[in-house]
Structure formats: C-alpha cells, structure tokens
C-alpha cells in the first residue's frame, strides 16, 4: 500500500512539472515553449545592444545640433565709440625737504648715530621706502669680532647675524628686536 502511494506521488509530480504552462520571460516578454536559458541570454544581449545603439544615435544627433548652433552664432552688435575723457589732473604739491618736515617719516637724520670709535660698523645700503610700518631702512654690518651691538644704554643685542636693519620712524632711528621697537641712540659694536 505504501509502495502504491509513493508511486502515485512520483508519477503525479513528474507529469505536472513537464506539463506546467510556461510564463512570459521577464527579459524578453515572450513565451518559450522549450525554455532554453541560452536563448534568453542571447536575446537579452541583442536587445541591450540595440538599446545602446539607439542611445548612441540620439547622442550623436544632439551633438550635431549643438555644433550647428555654435556655428550659427549671431555676431555681436557693434558698440558705440565712447568719447575720449581726459584723466583728472591732480593738483601740484610743493616739494619740501623731508629732513626738515617733522611729520614726515623720512625726517630722520641722514647719518646713522654710529660712534666714531666703532670702526667696524659700515653702512651697507639704504632701502627704498617700506609700505607697512616705516619709510627708510639702513642695513649695517659689524666686524667679525663683534659679540654684541649696543643700541642704547638700556638695550644691547647679541649678534647672531652680521646684518642689522634700522628703521626711520617718527623722526628717530628704530631697531626691531623681540617684537618691540627700540630707539637707537648710538650704535656700538662690542667685542665682549
């Protein structure tokens, strides 16, 4: 009895699988009686290539239209000529001697206060006017034997480099050191 039931079940499942209706393929939207997977793959590939081909044709047509529009650019209308306008003339200012003017930052004495006994200090060059905080600067060189540069009685600077820059500001020679300005009274190169 059990053997009969198993045979019936086996026969029933085999027949229903072979005779089941085929549904449309989701890729090709067609029914395939034989349901060959290779056929589906080839047809899908064909449809994808056709779609890509049509998209390429559309893009090429768009590019051609854009190129035609660029070639058919209308010329710009001519601009009217503007009349020539003379630039405004600035009033002539009288020249003054900068050493005599107290408000001018170039009013420092032209000679730097170097002591006569300091033979190894030599003025190197005078720079053009600075744009930010000073108008004139002078660089000095001291001899190789100097250890310190005496700026004033209250300030001495150790010599690490051989160049020092003095700045003319508010009528006095100043030296920037340690983010502070020091008024230069005399310059002496000290060997000790």
Swiss-Prot record:
It comes from the Eukaryota. Residues 77-91 have a biased composition (Pro residues). Residues 71-100 are annotated as: Disordered. This is Uncharacterized protein ZK688.1. It comes from Caenorhabditis elegans.
